[in-house]
Amino acid sequence: MQIFVKTLTGKTITLDVEPSDTIENVKAKIQDKEGIPPDQQRLIFAGKQLEDGRTLSDYNIQKESTLHLVLRLRGGIIEPSLALLASKYNCEKKICRKCYARLPPRATNCRKKKCGHTSQLRPKKKPKN
């Protein structure tokens, strides 16, 4: 049978599937056509997100049904080498005790006028792990 997959860009993909096909199989077919890895795909039908282990017939998906493809949001973790680089630039700074401006590590006076270019600087506190 034939089903349609509509992307967020409005593009419609046609797939030839069987009712016994799993959602994983459908995602693999989408990867073959579009090059989107299955772990980044979320398929929606009738307002429900489809789970990988289930079949098309479990969701009552029939011929010429339309599934909606949404890409999974990624984030939340930083590669260790990038975290080290970020800590070097963000954590080894000095802070003005009067205006709380962030200053370079070797600064001796604040660069802001509002605190009168004070020399009262402290090292930035280390983040709690």
UniProtKB/Swiss-Prot annotation:
InterPro entries (alphabetical): Ribosomal_eL40_dom (IPR001975), Ribosomal_eL40_sf (IPR038587), Ribosomal_zn-bd (IPR011332), Ubiquitin-like_dom (IPR000626), Ubiquitin-like_domsf (IPR029071), Ubiquitin_CS (IPR019954), Ubiquitin_dom (IPR019956), Ubiquitin_ubiquitin-like (IPR050158)
Pfam families cross-referenced by the UniProt entry: Ribosomal_L40e (PF01020), ubiquitin (PF00240)
Cellular component terms (Gene Ontology): cytoplasm; nucleus; ribonucleoprotein complex; ribosome
The keyword Aminoacyl-tRNA synthetase is assigned to this record: no
Entry keyword Nucleotide-binding: no
Numbered residues of crosslink Glycyl lysine isopeptide (Gly-Lys) (interchain with K-? in acceptor proteins): G76
Gene Ontology MF terms: structural constituent of ribosome
GO BP, one annotated term: translation
Keywords: Cytoplasm, Isopeptide bond, Nucleus, Ribonucleoprotein, Ribosomal protein, Ubl conjugation
Lineage top rank: taxon: Eukaryota
Coiled coil: none
Cross-link position per record: Glycyl lysine isopeptide (Lys-Gly) (interchain with G-Cter in ubiquitin): K48
Gene3D superfamilies on file: 4.10.1060.50, Phosphatidylinositol 3-kinase Catalytic Subunit, Chain A, domain 1 (3.10.20.90)
Region (Disordered): 110-129
Domain (Ubiquitin-like): residue spans on this chain: 1-76
Protein family per UniProt: In the N-terminal section; belongs to the ubiquitin family.
Record-given protein name: Ubiquitin-ribosomal protein eL40 fusion protein
Biological source species: Eimeria bovis
